[in-house]
C-alpha cells in the first residue's frame, strides 16, 4: 500500500497555499487576551482565494475608520477586498460568492449600493445576514 501523498512530496512541493498579509489578533483587539497569528487572505492550491471577513479597518495600522457610516465602512471594506484579491493575483471579476454581515437592517440599502459599485457586472451569489454585533462595536458591516 502506498504512503500518503504528503509524505511523498518534496519539501518545496508541500507549499500548496499562498498566505497574504499576516497579522496578530492582539493588534486588532488589544483589550482582549488574544494572541493568534492569522492571514487576511489565503490562495489555496493556486485555484481559490479565501478572505478573512473584511471591515472598515486600515490593513497596516489596524485603525478603525468611518465609525457609524455604513456606506463609507462598506467602501473601505471593498477596497480591502480588492487589494487582497490583487495581491492574490486576481480581481473582483472573479468573485463568485459574497456574504455580508450587518448589525442593523437599516444599513442594508447604503451597504448594497456601495457594494454594487464594486461588483457591477460580476453577478456573484450574495447573502446578507443581520447579526446582533460584530467583533468591534464600531463596525456595522463586514
Label the predicted regions.
Residues 2-93, 97, 102-142:
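N-terminal presequence-like segments and the immediate start of the first folded domain
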